[in-house]
């Protein structure tokens, strides 16, 4: 009688083959969705504004923009098992926003670095601001940011524009907003200065948000983005948002929220949505428009555009000596850290010290959010308002 092969040995062989296959599959690293992790660095001439990533279908701005080769970023890796690629940027070229009436961004990574999947991006301009972005655990990085400062030392006012853009359903809307919103706002302000209309700073910001949204919808792309921006001009600070990105200011050590989160559960937002024929319901403890989206304002979201508006809320303040610093951040931070906690963490690094370390403060805030269980992308900018006093 012929004996059959050992069934235990066969089972073990099958288990080994399955384990090998599974190991190979899970070793694939997910690359970022977009080849551009952040917008490329730009240099503006006094005669133009044209963004390289804008679609031919978008309305071209009046001025001309010349793109320069990005500087090679410095990459470092942390020691230990959880290594991460860090992109660092310091000292951008001087920007003259008076000579060139547009807002220019130098914040970027190269395509090569983005394709390698940078986990962390750091940028700073000593004495003015620091940026820190950390990719979450849910997938590709969908946040973008924008920062530009006119560092004129002729005794005149310093001008600046900052923005944090939190994408959902992909990074295209956040990337588009980062590249175009500042230019659109500046175009509206330039129009007002030329006497074409009498729009104020707030109305120029509103016009910039609406135009950015309209232009993105013409692109035919999916997804959307929440936005929070800070425009500083002639000693005035205008903070705006659409969505749940938030701006918090330290006024003598006390946290003051300068924006309100636009969620469907808010009474005024719920009333507006229902008046337009939409509905809001609760899914797993989160209120969502039409059962899908958890924010009620932002750029994009074409399939919910009837209810998700790009209309920003803006608050304008004259910068005063008691205004210490401003934090702009995505909800990856604010979902886990309260406004006052954020101010308490940052203040020892920025106030009453000879050499402020705002980048270290950014890292501490992000680490606190991650420690408390945040899985989302975290992007934040800390702006030292004392250096923009009129």
Curated annotation (Swiss-Prot):
GO terms for biological process: abscisic acid-activated signaling pathway; stomatal lineage progression. PROSITE patterns: PPM_1 (PS01032), PPM_2 (PS51746). Residues 1-10 have a biased composition (Polar residues). Residues 1-20, 40-85 are annotated as: Disordered. Signal peptide: none annotated. One of its GO terms (molecular function) is protein serine/threonine phosphatase activity. Binds 2 magnesium or manganese ions per subunit. The keyword Ubl conjugation does not apply. This is Probable protein phosphatase 2C 30. The lineage of its organism: Eukaryota, Viridiplantae, Streptophyta, Embryophyta, Tracheophyta.
């Amino acid at each position: 009688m012929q004996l059959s092969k050992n069934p235990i040995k066969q089972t073990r062989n099958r288990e080994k083959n399955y384990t090998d296959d599974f190991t190979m599959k899970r070793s694939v690293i997910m690359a970022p969705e977009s080849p551009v992790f952040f917008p490329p660095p730009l240099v503006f001439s006094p005669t133009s504004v044209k963004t390289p990533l804008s679609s031919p279908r978008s309305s071209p701005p009046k001025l001309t923009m010349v793109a320069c080769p990005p500087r090679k970023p410095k990459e470092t890796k942390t020691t230990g098992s959880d290594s991460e690629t860090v992109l660092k940027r310091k000292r951008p070229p001087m920007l003259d926003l008076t000579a060139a009436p547009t807002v220019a961004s130098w914040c970027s990574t190269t395509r090569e670095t983005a394709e390698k999947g940078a986990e962390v991006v750091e940028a700073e301009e000593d004495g003015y601001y620091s940026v820190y972005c950390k990719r979450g655990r849910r997938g590709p990085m969908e946040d973008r940011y924008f920062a530009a400062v006119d560092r004129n030392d002729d005794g005149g006012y310093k001008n600046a524009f900052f923005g944090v853009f939190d994408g959902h359903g992909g990074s295209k809307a956040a990337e588009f907003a980062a590249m175009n919103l500042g230019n659109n706002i500046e175009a509206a302000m330039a129009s007002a200065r030329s006497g074409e209309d009498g729009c104020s700073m707030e109305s120029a910001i509103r016009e910039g948000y609406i135009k950015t949204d309209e232009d993105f919808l013409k692109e035919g792309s999916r997804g959307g983005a929440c936005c929070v921006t800070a425009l500083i001009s002639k000693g005035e600070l205008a903070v705006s948002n659409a969505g749940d990105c938030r701006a918090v200011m330290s006024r003598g050590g006390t946290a003051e929220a300068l924006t309100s989160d636009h969620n469907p559960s808010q009474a005024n937002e719920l009333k507006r949505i229902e008046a337009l024929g939409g509905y809001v319901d609760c899914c797993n403890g989160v209120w969502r428009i039409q059962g899908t989206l958890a924010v009620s304002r932002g750029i994009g979201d074409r399939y919910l555009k009837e209810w998700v508006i790009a209309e920003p809320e803006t608050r304008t303040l004259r910068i005063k000596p008691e205004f210490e610093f401003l934090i702009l951040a995505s909800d990856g931070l604010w979902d886990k850290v309260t406004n006052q906690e954020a101010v308490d963490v940052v203040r020892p690094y920025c106030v009453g010290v000879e050499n402020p370390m705002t980048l270290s403060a950014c890292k501490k805030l992000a680490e606190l959010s991650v420690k408390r269980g945040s899985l989302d992308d975290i992007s934040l900018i800390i702006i030292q308002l004392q250096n923009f006093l009129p």
